[in-house]
From Swiss-Prot:
Family: Belongs to the MnmA/TRMU family.
Enzyme class name: transferase
EC number: 2.8.1.13
Disulfide bonds listed in the record: 101-199
Record Gene3D superfamilies: Adenine nucleotide alpha hydrolases-like domains, HUPs, Translation factors
Example GO BP: tRNA wobble position uridine thiolation
Annotated catalytic residues: 101 (nucleophile), 199 (cysteine persulfide intermediate)
NCBIfam families for the chain: PRK00143.1, trmU
Source organism per UniProt: Clavibacter michiganensis subsp. michiganensis (strain NCPPB 382)
Gene name as annotated: mnmA
Annotated positions for site Interaction with tRNA: 126, 345
Catalytic activity: S-sulfanyl-L-cysteinyl-[protein] + uridine(34) in tRNA + AH2 + ATP = 2-thiouridine(34) in tRNA + L-cysteinyl-[protein] + A + AMP + diphosphate + H(+)
Protein name (record): tRNA-specific 2-thiouridylase MnmA
Amino acid sequence: MKILAAMSGGVDSAVAAARAVEAGHDVTGVHLALSRMPGTLRTGSRGCCTIEDSMDARRAADLLGIPFYVWDFSERFAADVVDDFVAEYQAGRTPNPCMRCNERIKFAAVLEKALDLGFDAVCTGHYADVLEGPDGQPELHRAAAWAKDQSYVLGVLTAEQIAHSYFPLGSTPSKAEVRAEAQARGIQVAQKPDSHDICFIPDGDTRGWLADRVGAEPGEILDGEGNAIGTHQGAAAFTVGQRKGLAIGTPAPDGRPRFVLEIRPKDNTVVVGPQEALAIREIAGSSYTWAGTPPTRPDQPFDCDVQIRAHADPVPARAAVSVVDGSVQLVITPRDPLHGVAPGQTAVVYAGTRVLGQVTIDRTVSAVDDARPPMRDAALVGAAAGE
């Protein structure tokens, strides 16, 4: 196959490209320039997408003897990932920028350009696997290295995107093996630390970064009964389930800590309550996709596992496509309550190791009806915020 290897400058993508070459494919390397000002992105142990990363990727491509290019997607990244991140927080939601990047940049804009140029697939260093299903169609599966599995952040891929994706690290049992292989191949970034957190927030201070862009407007912190018990410096910086950073002047009657239950951008308030009030018995959303062949009857309840964070444990659940308040939604009912679920998060559903699909969470139903106020539909929240 003619393969476009996306090379971030890290060890995983370098080894993935090396394996593609070793497998006999016609490989070309590409590094994505995602920032208008690369110097503002993280460098060193916490970084990705910097000028240094571009040079690391070029050196790896030279070692492999493959052509190498840098593609500028900075404008698209700013609009589809960075601006979207800000807008979601302003609407009281909690986005996942890595998933948005996969959905709109790496496996959309980049893949589209690759196919236009005659490539058959895009190769990345993600820990996931593409296997042939019983119907002969490609399926997205978890990686063999469960601790490194990245199928969650790839849950936004469609059947067409999966068919043109190549993940050479999917069957690798551990990251240590990848590093050892890189060392043996003479790849300079063999011991380069993994990147973490959000690449476009230089110091990891999400609250400060957001304040610089949307302002820090003081507001009230409310308890479940609507009583003002504290103040904040900007509701946009909070997320459901958060405990740190709450300036609460009135202690809880039982002396226990309180957590963010809801963000209300319309009146710039944050609602807090006890930890048990975070328990959720149902999640749903209208923005859902299937990763390959959907369930035979998605309108009938089917068994699955649901995962709501990249490194969370999957939870057994039942799911079905239903009409709720006039909109078609994927509704998921976990066997045991989920905790700290925020509008804007992504729920990925699995059948064993296979990714079935994903949904952006718009609505939640509390498992403790009297412990927290009802969470409004995120579409209404966004409308109230002027989105």
